Regions:
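Domain-level detector for secreted/extracellular nuclease and nuclease-toxin modules, and
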Residues: 3-8, 15-299
Length: 299
């Protein structure tokens, strides 16, 4: 649809492996290096990993060289997943919950500014996912904002990227106070970090704590109980930080939201920054040093 390539997962770089087994690091990077927009339905187990589990079978450098795909979590078959590669981000969309499992992108200093404007761009359904599709009417009179996961402010560098950020597969029902307040402040802080460090790798998405969830609209879009965001910066000493924000109107000091990436992985069940060398991944995810993340927009 719309000229995009639609590729069955079994034929696309062997991205998905045996059930509940994460994709290999090399396959993640190969996927990240594809330039076209694609949709990949992740429902078919295929090849085995091309590196033994538990080894640093990776030639990625800790200083950021060869870092294509650092932002991608491990693809899995343990939950409904359609992988959507867009110009400015990659999304794992869940056709059951009607919201993304996660959205990931590489935010560079060059991407935080540009001439692409959000004014006049409507939220619109994503024709690359099967019906029934979420549309903007599902949110009408729901009491929730259409909350971007990859924010429009991170896509000012390109008009197509900006337009794609308004696809409903990049959107979750979000409390209004959170959307315009603490969550918006975190988005602004990420852009400042990208400018300060040259680039960062970001993953965010909904947190579903409960067994049963509130839904909105005729398509029964699931309302998350919280949202997560994890951020990686490379360099001589790679650092990572995680955040959990409850989906409500309560405001807190920024430090109350901070978590290690390991803790966010425990809460969400995702394996973040899966293409990093294992030793680097373990190091940056184990703990967070807030002193290594100077803040300006989070006060």
């Amino acid at each position: 649809m719309n000229g995009r390539k639609h590729l069955c997962i079994a034929l696309f770089l062997s991205v998905i492996v045996a059930a509940c087994t994460p994709v290999s690091k090399k396959a993640l990077r190969a996927y990240a290096e594809t330039k076209e927009d694609v949709s990949v339905v992740a429902d078919t187990p295929t090849a085995q990993q091309d590196e033994p589990s538990g080894r640093d079978g990776d030639d990625t450098q800790a200083d950021g060289e060869g870092g294509e795909g650092y932002e991608l979590p491990a693809f899995r078959t343990s939950s409904d997943e359609i992988i959507l590669k867009r110009k400015g981000y990659t999304a794992s969309y869940n056709p059951t919950t009607k919201i993304p499992n996660w959205v990931a992108w590489h935010l560079t200093a060059e991407h935080v500014d540009g001439y692409a404007k959000r004014k006049g761009i409507p939220f619109h359904e994503d024709e690359d996912v099967p019906e029934p599709r979420v549309d903007t009417y599902d949110y009408m009179r729901s009491g929730y904002d259409r909350g971007h996961m990859c924010p429009a402010g991170d896509n000012k560098w390109d008009a197509e990227a900006m337009e794609q950020s308004f696809l409903m597969t990049n959107i979750c029902p979000q409390d209004h106070v959170l959307n315009i307040g603490d969550w918006n402040n975190l988005e602004a802080q990420c852009r400042q970090w990208a400018e300060q460090y040259g680039s960062i790798y970001v993953v965010c998405g909904p947190v579903l704590y409960n067994k049963r969830h509130k839904t909105i609209g005729k398509n029964k879009v699931v309302v998350p109980e919280a949202f997560f965001k994890v951020i990686l910066r490379m360099g001589r000493t790679p650092q990572a930080i995680g955040f959990i924000y409850r989906n409500n109107d309560k405001r807190h000091p920024w430090g109350d939201y901070v978590n290690s990436v390991d803790e966010v992985e425990r809460i969400t069940g995702f394996d973040f920054f899966a293409s990093l060398p294992d030793s680097v991944e373990r190091q940056v995810e184990r703990q967070v040093n807030v002193d290594m993340w100077p803040i300006q927009a989070l006060h």
